[in-house]
């Protein structure tokens, strides 16, 4: 009886200590469901890029532009996609009237070109990007859905910078916002293709 009590007490102490053995697949699921807040809203890894982006108050301009360009269905698709998502503040850095002009129906092709320049095929987390930079000797080229390239550099631990075809740079301010169909990295400037 004493042995049984001791064994039960030890098992209870182990359980109450919070130490638990969780199968790897359950751990993966728990990590996958970890949310990140962007623009005051939780971003759920079980939702797609559009389902999450529409809830971020910091990305209303981007969402409006995606709708105007007719890219909603694409970004709701299976992907996977890596999206460098400029904030409203990033769009605000463009010359006055630029966004209003771009969302006009007659400028849809130009808007689509700019937006697809922010999208890279595949799921590139910050770890993947930093590895590509390391393997590239300090920088990495990423081919965008638009067809042109972005340059990624690392400046300090975990700080990623994106350079566009015009030489403008944007900092990744929030990395690894996981989506069911890819990953979003929030950036502080709009990236522009060469043409």
Language model features: what each stretch is:
Residues 11-12, 20, 119, 133:
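Generic low-complexity, intrinsically disordered sequence content enriched
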Residues 5-6, 20:
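Generic extreme N-terminus detector
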Residues 16-24:
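C-terminal segment of classical bacterial N-terminal signal peptides
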Residues 6-14:
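Sec-dependent N-terminal signal peptides
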Residues 2-5, 25-195:
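Mature, structured domains of secreted/extracytosolic soluble proteins
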């Amino acid at each position: 009886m004493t042995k049984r009590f001791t064994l039960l007490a030890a098992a209870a102490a182990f359980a109450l200590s919070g130490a638990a053995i969780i199968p790897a697949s359950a751990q993966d699921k728990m990590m996958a469901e970890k949310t990140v807040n962007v623009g005051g809203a939780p971003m759920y890894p079980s939702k797609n890029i559009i389902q999450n982006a529409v809830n971020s108050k910091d990305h209303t301009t981007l969402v409006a532009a995606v709708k105007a360009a007719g890219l909603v269905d694409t970004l709701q698709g299976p992907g996977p996609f890596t999206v460098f998502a400029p904030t409203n503040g990033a769009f605000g850095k463009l010359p006055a009237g630029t966004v209003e002009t771009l969302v006009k129906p007659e400028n849809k092709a130009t808007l689509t070109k700019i937006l697809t320049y922010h999208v890279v095929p595949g799921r590139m987390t910050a770890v993947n990007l930093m590895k590509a930079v390391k393997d590239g000797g300090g920088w990495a080229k990423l081919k965008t859905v638009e067809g042109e390239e972005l340059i990624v550099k690392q400046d300090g631990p975990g700080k990623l910078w994106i350079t566009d075809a015009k030489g403008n740079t944007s900092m990744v301010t929030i990395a690894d916002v996981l989506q069911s169909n890819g990953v979003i990295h929030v950036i502080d400037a709009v990236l522009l293709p060469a043409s």
